Amino acid sequence: MEQVQAGNPGAFTALFERHRAPLYGFVLRMTREEASAEDCFQDTFLSVHRARQTWSRAAGTFRSWLFRIAANAVHDHQRRSSRRPLVLTEEELPLPVRDWPEERLMLERALAQLPPHLREAFLLGAMHGLDHSELAEALDISPDNARARLSRARTQLRQLLGGS
């Protein structure tokens, strides 16, 4: 990000490529539909580009800042649009998803049943590897609250998946 701020012409493209897959995965799991995910993904990188001079290392990691912008884009999108049901039928799943192993489909369905604030914490912490302090920065909550949300999300997922 510092290269982007310094005006390096290829730096934003490199930054985009580095974070594209995990960020798109996050917004897709939060929105549960490709069109909404693409909108949120584009909004995120547009916001990053517009706010590129406001990020500083002192404020936290770039990754937590990026995911915070993405989470805000998802929240804004959800407020603006009417929501589809979170649990999709087999026919509504995109074709590649239909080929997933049954365990993966079960996890995706269980994630869809979590309250949005717990799903967001689980996706960022457990699936995208943000540590508790990064998770707290990304969600704009305290580290203790981040740890608690992640724990509650894991507990609820275990219950939804039939574990103890």
Per-segment meaning from a language model:
Residues 5-14, 24-43, 57, 163-164:
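Short, charged helix-capping/linker segments at alpha-helix termini
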Residues 6-9, 82, 94-124, 128-138, ...:
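Amphipathic alpha-helical segment used for protein-protein interaction
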Residues 16-17, 28, 125-127, 132, ...:
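Short amphipathic helical patch at the helix-1/turn junction of helix-turn-helix
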Residues 16-34, 51, 67, 111:
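Amphipathic, Lys/Arg- and hydrophobic-enriched alpha-helical face
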Residues 25, 39-46, 60-72:
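Structural recognition of an alpha-helix C-terminal capping motif at a helix-to-coil junction
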Residues 44, 69, 122, 135-136, ...:
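Hydrophobic positions on the alpha-helical face of helix-turn-helix-like DNA-binding modules
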Residues 50-57, 67-88, 100:
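Arg/Lys-rich amphipathic alpha helix in sigma70-family domain 2
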Residues 75, 118, 127, 139-164:
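DNA-recognition helix of helix-turn-helix
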